[in-house]
Regions:
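Lectin-like carbohydrate-binding module/patch detector with strong preference for beta-trefoil
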Residues: 2-4, 8-217
Length: 217
């Protein structure tokens, strides 16, 4: 199992055929349902209310920052919905370490290598805080920092566990709702930041490749 997980991780990072990679990743992840999300894992985040996946592609916003757009995508089989979970640059966390509630994380879009980002620009449809993708390998700032908040009594992030991601700079929670983009196909909906805690702020780690927990001390 460990070998197959690592092989799938390599395929994901090298950008293998999207359909085959998606199918293989889902098969691997279903076998380890409920395991811990670790740094270096490549996962899809599912919005609890609408079941859309957090998604991005190399298409800029037509307003606000003009940075790479982020949306909610209704289809499961799409390789543009994979995100690599990374620690903050000044953290001592290593690949394979479990992630506790309160940790500051970054999410790197697998395909474009840009970071999930937010700032004070208004989002296109609702006028909330814009969420974009920005930067790249070796280019990251505090606008890419998100604090993990686990719902309930859990202390360590696991697959299928309800979580919120709160943007460190703006205080906005990663949020989505059923406001749809007309110019984007496939029923894509707005992702934005909202400072209030709402049911629409809740996400779950879903399909993906979950790296084994690092047991070394």
């Amino acid at each position: 199992m460990a070998a197959s997980v690592l092989a799938l991780a390599v395929a994901l990072l090298l950008g293998g055929a999207s359909y085959g990679v998606d199918r293989g990743a889902e098969a691997a992840s279903s076998a380890v349902e409920g395991v811990e999300v670790t740094y270096g894992s490549t996962v899809k985040l599912m919005h609890e209310k609408t079941k859309h996946r957090l998604h991005s592609h190399d298409v800029p916003y037509g307003s606000g920052s003009g940075q790479q757009s982020v949306t909610g995508f209704p289809e499961v089989d799409d390789s543009n919905s994979y995100w690599i979970v990374r620690p903050a640059p000044d953290s001592s966390a290593k690949q394979g370490d479990a992630i506790e509630t309160g940790s500051i994380i970054r999410l790197q879009h697998m395909r474009t290598r840009r970071w999930l980002h937010s700032h004070l620009h208004a989002s296109p449809l609702s006028g909330n805080l814009e969420v974009s993708c920005f930067g790249g390998d070796g280019q990251s700032d505090t606008g890419d920092y998100w604090r993990l908040e686990i719902e309930g009594s859990g202390k360590v992030w696991k697959r299928d566990q309800k979580v919120r991601l709160r943007h460190v700079d703006t205080g906005g929670y990663l949020h989505s709702h059923n406001k749809k983009y007309n110019r984007l196909g496939g029923g894509q909906q707005e992702v934005c930041g909202v400072r209030e805690k709402r049911a629409e702020n809740i996400w779950l780690a879903a399909e993906g490749v979950y790296l084994p927990v690092n047991e070394s001390k």
